[in-house]
Amino acid sequence: MSKFSKKFISASPFKQQDPTGQNQRNILSDIEYKSDEFLGFPEEKARQRTDEYLGIKPDKDGLMEDQNSFEHGDTARHYMGGDQLSRSIREKLGSLGKTSLGRIIGVIGSNVGGLVHEAQNIKEGRPILESVEDATNNFVGSLGSLFSTNTSTRILDRLKKYLPDGKVKD
């Protein structure tokens, strides 16, 4: 377990064990968490990039507005998630990550990770169309990772009005 994980878990006011028979861990959540940890928590990095992109700053109490409350917030979050996961995979590949093959591996890995995440959401009862929209934004973000971070952000600026919003009514 990483230092980040230990610090987070030890600081939690909630008991870290599930009540017997409830919220059983499953293979998808295990894969998602272990991958996130192995890759240096790209989901958290994507969240921070999205906060910066949307101009979200903590209030006087340290609380922050929900990204989904902003126009294009969900779109940006999934785009940045796909972008950041691809970059994190490429970083793990070392010098191979800077090659065309490494970039392709990053894009493919990012999309596999996004699909595992969305499969988990469907299993938890989220609407299928919402996951399809989110996976679309993850895919476009993974392609954005083929460019510099600044260029990728400019691509999001241009495409966000055309991408799905990821907000589906139940």
PLM features per residue range, with description:
Residues 1-22:
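Gly/Thr/Ser/Pro-rich low-complexity intrinsically disordered regions
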Residues 17-131, 135-170:
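Bulky hydrophobic segments
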